[in-house]
Amino acid sequence: MSGHTKWHEIRRKKGVLDQRRGQRWTKIARDITIAAREGGGSPDMNFRLRLAIEKAKADNMPADNIQRAIDRGTGVSGEAALEEVTYEGYGPGGIAVIVDAATDNRNRTVSEIRTAFNKNGGTLGEGGSVGWMFDIKGLISIDRTEKTDPDEVTLLAIDADADDVIVNDDAIIVYTEFSKLAAVRDALNEQGLKISTAEKTMLAKTIMEADEATTFQILRLMERLEDLDDVQKVYSNLEVSDELAEKYAEQG
């Protein structure tokens, strides 16, 4: 397990994902708004919007909140428009970090992100400074149950034109070309598999390791970044061992 998937697992173990429903809803609503702005307000015609709405419903977000987010994206509500912005920089030890944000005020967002980097041993770089180190991919997470046959799921994913399949204890992670995410996700869904996540991810072309102290510094930086309201996702090329991930998560 690596990249954003490992980071998400660390956050889950720390209980952060359960503690901050309001913040999660804010980020999901921004996903919905951006998707509606880019592809229109119909989930039947807009795959990204459909995924965002499914994520919102899975997190028990009220229907009114979902509709308000759609209305903001399509311009019905009259609220300030959101735009997607990507920031790039380096964490401690030269680890590459990419930050996806959704904002209605670039100056506020870049100031908050720069402060997070500076206070946690990192440096905010220029656009393109580390982006070349990553590939944009589709990520599908399938929940494992007692009845799940990893070999069968792997074959189904490959038949659906997936790039790679990683089998973990509680989930099976499927990577796809980003352009094929919708098709692969729908093909797996038709097989009755329980898909918990289908989203864009940034997959590092080359991963880097760091000692324990540096690893924890980088994870703290990523945590501070992801806690910012405008930040949607944080990626890095840091490889974290299961042992260090567990140790960091236990810090609370």
Swiss-Prot record:
The keyword DNA-binding applies. InterPro entries: Integrase-like_N (IPR017856), TACO1_YebC-like_2nd/3rd_dom (IPR048300), TACO1_YebC_N (IPR049083), Transcrip_reg_TACO1-like (IPR002876), Transcrip_reg_TACO1-like_dom3 (IPR026564), YebC-like (IPR029072). One of its GO terms (biological process) is regulation of DNA-templated transcription. GO terms for molecular function: DNA binding. It comes from the Bacteria. HAMAP family: Transcrip_reg_TACO1 (MF_00693). This is Probable transcriptional regulatory protein Haur_3030.
